[in-house]
């Protein structure tokens, strides 16, 4: 006799499996950043304030004052006023998003965003493939005053030709002027660990967490560039993009970040065996370190000083900058001095790309550092791999 209860259960299971969202099996894929002119100029102190706020640290008074006093102004773009975004298809719409290894949300400008706030942006319109998650909301805010919030949908998201049909898409209903004025950036795609996704009441998985099982390896590699668009490789490493071998180190993801410890550091020819614990964050522009390291670095730069009116260390634009290196196992990752010359702040002065992490509690290895390296983010460890860019 056929067990009808068992048959019904098996049938229901088969239907559920068939209906579950899946990503096609692929070996790997790459997505290139696109260089776009910035629509606004923001003082570098605003970048520093944003990093403090991102990690829920109090923004130092002088940094906040410098960022607030300068604000944002429209500027004619120049070769030095570019930012780098990546094209992503969300539902039926193609948007330019920031890929951010320091957060775990995929949020976008949308048709729900007031028209005055989305002017100049490409935006997501939930269509027939979208399914709203009832009761789900999200909200982010940063120390520079930027913020966004809204509802959540499940929809098809395609990155580099690979799609996931039921990705959580955080649709912006409110967006602050800091995001609104950046008309080339239509949102963010987070690549940190899903445990820090901000959707309430139930956090959602990142795009990478959803597709990693379909890749030949559960990894992505980042090759950001100095004054040029970079590339993200998903599922594989590209030996043409780095020299030597890749050195790996363990990741502590207990706080949801790609956190690692460097065994020591060097400033020019001076070295220290003091370790540095920090996170690899493509969504933070600067390299933020302990005060003792920052002070030691600028002691080697003629004319450098902490300028409270600028909210950080500045130096004469003609100054020669030493390299900064960290030791990871047997590997030395070196940031050329020229990469640390971050932004002109007038009067022949330049804002440094190395600044204080005071109050954050750990260091931030942002783009100033990452642009010198080919970095592998390996979820199987988890671990990080480093090699010099080719």
Swiss-Prot record:
Signal peptide coordinates: 1-19
Domain Peptidase A1: residue ranges: 84-387
Prosegment location in residue numbers: 20-67
PANTHER family for the chain: ASPERGILLOPEPSIN-1-RELATED (PTHR47966:SF2), BETA-SITE APP-CLEAVING ENZYME, ISOFORM A-RELATED (PTHR47966)
Primary role: Secreted aspartic endopeptidase that allows assimilation of proteinaceous substrates. The scissile peptide bond is attacked by a nucleophilic water molecule activated by two aspartic residues in the active site. Shows a broad primary substrate specificity. Favors hydrophobic residues at the P1 and P1' positions, but also accepts a lysine residue in the P1 position, leading to the activation of trypsinogen and chymotrypsinogen A. Hydrolyzes myoglobin, hemoglobin and other natural proteins.
Gene: pepA
Protein name according to UniProt: Aspergillopepsin-1
Domain of life of the organism encoding this protein: Eukaryota
């Amino acid at each position: 006799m056929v067990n009808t209860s068992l048959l019904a259960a098996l049938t229901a299971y088969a239907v559920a499996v068939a209906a579950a969202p899946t990503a096609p099996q692929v070996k790997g894929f790459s997505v290139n950043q696109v260089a776009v002119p910035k629509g606004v100029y923001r003082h570098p102190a605003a970048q520093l304030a944003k990093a403090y706020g991102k990690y829920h640290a109090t923004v130092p008074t002088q940094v906040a004052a410098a960022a607030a006093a300068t604000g944002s102004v429209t500027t004619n773009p120049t070769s030095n006023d570019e930012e780098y975004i990546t094209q992503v298809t969300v539902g039926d719409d193609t948007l330019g998003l920031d890929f951010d290894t320091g957060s775990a949300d995929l949020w976008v400008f949308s048709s729900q965003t007031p028209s005055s706030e989305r002017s100049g942006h490409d935006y997501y319109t939930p269509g027939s493939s979208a399914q709203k998650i009832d009761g789900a909301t999200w909200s982010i805010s940063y120390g520079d005053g930027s913020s966004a919030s809204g509802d959540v949908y499940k929809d098809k998201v395609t990155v580099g030709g690979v799609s996931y049909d039921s990705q959580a898409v955080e649709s912006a209903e409110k967006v602050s002027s800091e995001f609104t004025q950046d008309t080339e950036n239509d949102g963010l795609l987070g690549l940190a660990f899903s445990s820090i996704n901000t959707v309430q009441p139930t956090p959602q998985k990142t795009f990478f967490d959803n597709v990693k099982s379909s890749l030949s390896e559960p990894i992505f590699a980042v090759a950001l560039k100095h004054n040029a668009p970079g590339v993200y490789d998903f599922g594989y490493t590209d030996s043409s993009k780095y020299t030597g071998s890749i050195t790996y180190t363990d990741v502590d993801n207990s706080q949801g970040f790609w956190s690692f410890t460097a065994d020591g550091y060097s400033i020019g020819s001076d070295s220290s065996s003091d370790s540095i614990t920090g996170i690899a964050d493509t969504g933070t522009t600067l390299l933020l370190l302990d005060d003792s390291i920052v002070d030691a670095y600028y002691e080697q730069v003629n004319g450098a000083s902490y300028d409270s009116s600028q909210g950080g260390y500045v130096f004469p634009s003609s100054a020669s900058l030493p390299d900064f290196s960290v030791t990871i196992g047997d590997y030395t990752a070196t940031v050329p001095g020229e990469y640390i010359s971050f932004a002109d702040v007038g009067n022949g002065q330049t804002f440094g790309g190395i600044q204080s992490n005071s109050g954050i509690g750990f260091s931030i290895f942002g783009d100033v550092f990452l642009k010198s390296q080919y970095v592998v983010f390996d979820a199987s460890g988890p671990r990080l791999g480093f090699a010099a860019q080719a």
